[in-house]
Regions:
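Alpha/beta-hydrolase active-site loop
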Residues: 30, 60-80
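The alpha/beta-hydrolase serine catalytic core
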Residues: 105-191, 195-203, 207-208, 212-237
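Glycine-rich nucleophile elbow surrounding the catalytic serine of serine-hydrolase chemistry
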Residues: 90-100
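Conserved alpha/beta-hydrolase
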Residues: 33-56
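Short, surface-exposed "cap/lid" segments of acyl-processing enzymes
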Residues: 5-41
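Short beta-to-alpha linker loops that shape the active-site pocket of alpha/beta-hydrolase fold enzymes
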Residues: 17, 50-55, 117, 207
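Alpha/beta-hydrolase fold nucleophile elbow
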Residues: 81-92
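A short loop-to-beta-strand scaffold at the N-terminal edge of the catalytic core in hydrolase folds
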Residues: 1-3
Length: 237
């Protein structure tokens, strides 16, 4: 996290859910480079968040836990005297949770969600499979976690970006999705746009799920962030 001027906009970058072994470390390590670019080239204060259970972060994965991590990151940035406003940028699961967090935090100025699912119903249909996968990739290390499996699983149905997107309006929402995403259907992007009511939708032709590595998607994101500077000093809706 860095900033070089006295009053700057701030952004939290939230990674997605890892898909394979060792990806829990990779997922959280992929965004610091982007954060440095946003800070160095655009003058923002940028935080690359490593959710609990990923990278060097302690704790174990749960959707509510990740949502709490996002809220804590926003609170941390808002406490900085030099910060003029906070935005959220999330990839995959991090994008969906960014929408949910911002809907409940009216001081967040806007959200960009890339490759974000509209809900987690697929996970909710097979919660034990998700739990075992989370153990396999190192996101759950404690053998006794979760102490309340039913509660852990319930979060998979209760936390839904599509339900929270209307609460983000009229604050800006950018939805970016790959036309060839094989993990999250492009239909989810359109559902989120409709739920918000005034979101900007950009479909990347031929792109898959990992938009962090697509130069076109990153260019769209940086352009959107640059336009958000004009919102500084105005109420976030």
């Amino acid at each position: 996290m860095r900033a070089d001027v006295t009053s700057v906009p701030a952004v939290v970058l939230a990674h997605g859910y890892p898909s394979d072994v060792n990806a829990a470390t990779v997922a959280s390590s992929a965004l610091p480079e982007l954060a440095d670019r946003i800070a160095g080239e655009m003058g923002w204060m940028a935080m690359a968040l490593a959710f609990r259970g990923c990278g060097a972060s302690e704790g174990s994965f749960s959707l509510q836990g990740w949502l709490d991590d996002l809220r804590a990151a926003v609170a941390h940035l808002e406490a900085e005297e030099s910060v003029s406003g906070v935005w959220l940028v999330g990839f995959g699961t991090g994008g969906a949770l960014s929408i949910c967090a911002a809907a409940a935090l009216p001081d967040v100025h806007g959200v960009a969600a890339l490759g974000a699912p509209a809900d987690f119903d697929d996970w909710a249909s097979h919660p034990r499979r998700l739990l075992e996968h989370s153990r396999e990739v190192g996101m759950i290390k404690e053998s006794t976690f979760p102490t309340n499996f039913d509660g852990w699983a319930r979060e998979l149905r209760d936390i839904r970006a599509v339900a929270d997107a209307p609460g983000l309006h009229p604050r800006p929402l950018l939805i970016v999705h790959g036309s060839d995403d094989d993990l999250v259907p492009v239909f989810d992007a359109r559902v989120l746009v409709d739920a918000h009511g005034d979101a900007e939708l950009r479909i990347m032709t031929g792109a898959g799920h990992r938009l962090r590595h697509d130069p076109r998607a990153v260019a769209v994101l940086l352009g959107w962030l640059d336009r958000q500077r004009n919102r500084i000093g105005s109420a976030p809706g």
